[in-house]
């Protein structure tokens, strides 16, 4: 199933238990300005950092390592909102990882915006993420993604991996 990411550039999954572990409502994300939304290790509470590390390892062991045995975790980010830069089709391949998960802590609706869309050679797909949605995304040429503008709370974490596939 995870290898499907190499066909369309994404795989949609659902992991509601991550919300129970993270308890995101207990934390404030400091960085929330356009183009400065990413909150990394030094920007978040120690307990939230530990929880995100656990989830990163969990996702690696459950989804990535069985398909890519030489893979490694790189880093994670967490943010609220959508940067204008991310509203257009793009890849993140300059960031140095091969695949990544997007995990959604909040529910979006068509009328509130905040969708996620994927594009590959001969198709496109768009989703309104709900709390607990998890998307595995290919970070290589030929696959693009974009986020829809929104003014609602839209907290998302990215868990990034190198597959080290030959």
Residue map of PLM features:
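Non-heme Fe(II)/2-oxoglutarate
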Residues: 1-69, 75
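Catalytic core of non-heme Fe(II) oxygenases with the double-stranded beta-helix
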Residues: 68-166
């Amino acid at each position: 199933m995870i290898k499907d990411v190499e066909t369309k550039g994404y795989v949609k999954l659902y992991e509601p238990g991550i919300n129970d572990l993270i308890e995101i409502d207990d934390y404030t994300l400091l960085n929330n300005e356009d183009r400065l939304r990413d909150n990394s290790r030094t920007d978040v509470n120690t307990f939230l950092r530990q929880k995100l590390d656990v989830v990163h390892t969990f996702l690696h062991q459950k989804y990535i390592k069985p398909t890519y045995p030489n893979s490694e975790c790189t880093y994670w980010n967490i943010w609220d909102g959508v940067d204008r830069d991310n509203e257009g089709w793009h890849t993140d391949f300059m960031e140095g990882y091969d695949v990544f998960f997007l995990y959604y802590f909040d529910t979006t609706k068509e009328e509130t915006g905040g969708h996620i869309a994927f594009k590959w050679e001969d198709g496109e797909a768009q989703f309104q993420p709900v709390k607990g949605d998890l998307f595995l995304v290919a970070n290589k040429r030929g696959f693009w993604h974009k986020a829809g503008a929104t003014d609602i709370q839209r907290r998302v974490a990215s868990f990034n991996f190198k597959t080290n596939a030959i």
